[in-house]
Amino acid sequence: MFKVVICDDERIIREGLKQIIPWGDYHFNTIYTAKDGVEALSLIQQHQPELVITDIRMPRKNGVDLLNDIAHLDCNVIILSSYDDFEYMKAGIQHHVLDYLLKPVDHAQLEVILGRLVRTLLEQQSQNGRSLAPCHDAFQPLLKVEYDDYYVNQIVDQIKQSYQTKVTVSDLIQHIDVSESYAMRTFKDHVGITIVDYLNRYRILQSLQLLDRHYKHYEIADKVGFSEYKMFSYHFKKYLQMSPSDYCKQAK
């Protein structure tokens, strides 16, 4: 759904952010990387990402110059720096930067920022009447990054790891030392929906990314864990109030 450009002259940092952060959980399905501001500017102009994460001190074109070049674009920016100095703070204030992160990057802190950002992006899409607006309410329960219950968080993690398989509730809770009835009741109390409902909503959410990649619909159904295409189609219509084909037409 959303796109991000990660710009840093240190390969270990940009590739680390690309690989370690669970971008799909925050609805970012396309991640681009650049080693300097020149590469980043080209990617930004070409792909129009919703988020840019950039270092400040880089060769060829630094982060401040990059901010100047993209000031007219509608994208969010997170600044990375090894220096807690006024130069990049001033640049960030001038360009309405979303947040600042000092290296080494605290991944948990970045995920908190992403959680806030995705809520804003989805709300904007809903207000603008864009194609994702109908699914905003359906996917609202999936937006919370962490719950205040250990078992609920474990179940959510298991869903995200195994949704592509023909997984059952028993499979999802087999690694936690509680009964199935307790797990189901606790999950519903904290999340507001059942485990099975969460699983199916998450599968449909992931399917939207594959619809954008021109897979056949029966292939998508299998890739996101539905045993039959008709079950995929049923849940798609249930949550989005339209068929996969109609969604694709509306998204064009």
Swiss-Prot record:
Residues 170-191, 217-240 bind DNA. Keywords: Cytoplasm, DNA-binding, Phosphoprotein, Transcription, Transcription regulation, Two-component regulatory system. The keyword Cytoplasm applies. GO terms for biological process: phosphorelay signal transduction system. It is found in: Cytoplasm. The modification 4-aspartylphosphate is found at residue 55. Its main location: cytoplasm. One of its GO terms (molecular function) is DNA-binding transcription factor activity. The keyword Transcription regulation applies. Residues 3-118 form the Response regulatory domain. It holds the Pfam family Response_reg. Residues 153-250 form the HTH araC/xylS-type domain. Phosphorylated by HptS. SUPFAM superfamilies: CheY-like, Homeodomain-like. GO terms for cellular component: cytoplasm. Member of the two-component regulatory system HptS/HptR that regulates genes involved in hexose phosphate transport system in response to changes in extracellular phosphate sources. Activates uhpT expression to facilitate glucose-6-phosphate/G6P utilization by directly binding to its promoter. Antagonizes CcpA-dependent transcription of a subset of CcpA-regulated genes involved in antibiotic susceptibility. PANTHER family: HISTIDINE KINASE-RELATED, TRANSCRIPTIONAL REGULATORY PROTEIN HPTR. This is Transcriptional regulatory protein HptR. It comes from Staphylococcus aureus (strain MRSA252).
